[in-house]
Regions:
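Ribonuclease/tRNase effector modules and their secretory precursors
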Residues: 1-172
Length: 172
């Protein structure tokens, strides 16, 4: 399955990010265990992007990614900037957990974004709150973090869920 990635020190992580190609199969995999609030902040402040992990090949096939056996989940500074600016109740720590939240989602919907790219919207209920993680696939064989929201209540009652559900049913 996925290769075991060791836990790195922050200096090793910075070096990996700084020396990483910006795209392609030679971009190293950071590993979810190495993505924390400090690393998310470093990516944002230094205008970087990095592959967090490889995506499950069957999931990558569903998204019509060109090379499903080597598809990557990628985070970049633009998504982090957008989330922190538009959704002020989310922190670097929340963003660092985006892959875990999307994998453990109560519900995941597949649809197209406004540029007709495959989009995955994952809804995770956490006590009286819910978190939405949106990831979009691109031509570079990547599933990019697009945005995140956090709101009170049950996700199934939210306008964002109802709109996303309607769009996902129309794009099938």
């Amino acid at each position: 399955k996925a290769e075991a990635l060791k836990k790195l020190h922050f200096d090793e992580i910075k070096k990996l990010i700084d020396e990483s190609p910006r795209t392609g199969s030679s971009m190293p995999i950071l590993g979810m265990q190495n993505l924390n609030a400090e690393v998310v902040e470093y990516i944002q402040k230094n205008h970087k992007r990095i592959a967090v992990e490889k995506i499950e090949p069957s999931f990558a096939k569903d998204l019509k990614l060109k090379y499903p056996d080597d598809a990557r989940a990628v985070i970049d500074y633009q998504a982090i900037n957008h989330i922190l600016k538009e959704h002020k109740n989310l922190s670097f720590e929340d963003i660092a957990n985006y892959r875990e939240l999307s994998k453990q989602a109560n519900e995941t919907l597949k649809l197209k974004d406004n540029q007709n790219r495959p989009l995955v919207a994952s809804f995770k209920q956490i006590n009286g709150f819910f978190v939405v993680v949106e990831q979009v696939s691109n031509a570079k064989n990547e599933l990019m973090l697009k945005t995140m929201y956090k709101a009170r209540g049950d996700y199934r009652d939210s306008l964002i869920y109802k709109r996303t559900l309607a769009k996902s049913q129309n794009s099938n």
